[in-house]
């Protein structure tokens, strides 16, 4: 008789689910689309922010989107708004990469065409060389109403481009560290054109063919490069995950799994907030610095108050609810690197596979304080989940994330 380890099977299923989610989400638009699809599959209704929110009763679950890349989902709790706080998980849909510029085609010697790009976020440039790349994002199309153009998503799944390294024969110092020019060195090759063809609108024509539209109906686009290499497991026991965009799609997936894991009506209202543009400061209408999440949550309280026929001031109820809320800002943390241990704090360095991490920063780049850390650690203890702490090496500047912006 073969013994089956249920815990190992569950972990394996979650890992496979994450790999599928990563591969289906090459850029922020597809990450949001994948998230929306999973929510609808599990009974969440779609709301339109331009329409009146329905009266909400306990157990109702909905989601609303912002600009195609931010998704906010919630499940209404049993208690009246002022009697319980929101329980939120926040993460972000964007990752560092390259955005295609307008008028992107550049004709080179030998009729080779490359595309003009600009770096998005804090990319490690050298990791983009000599990889099979493609395009994904959204395309905006003309309609009869100038104020309401049509949006189409485009995900080219086959390798289409490559950013080619310079051969070592022309760059003998390549392994000694080379300063890269974002404008010169990081432009992907698209192909070789025939003598009879022109580079004029070459990319638009390719987009038009793929979408089945006329080139002149393409008004604009938000297109990005992505690495077509599928996400996979590595390691002797497949204990590691190798993929781009783990920051922060792994936490988007974890937040989704947490929301879907329990479909019972909760005591307090649960919410999952996935923002965009964290990698560039969160200052957009779909970013964490925008008022959209607060507006959605306030409208949620108003709608629930109407359904319960409450006589209290719903706006005051909203503020009271905020004061009782708890938010987890879910982002990636740096585990101990076996080749660069000196970069880590000597006493607060997490290791892979030893539980979630509480990140602390004296400059307040994270939301964590002693009170929040105590609550999270107690939740972990009661759930039987080990946890770790992370603090930056004092000589190494760390990054920031959503938490301190939202709180």
Identify the role of each PLM range.
Residues 1-407:
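N-terminal hydrophobic/helix-forming segments and targeting peptides
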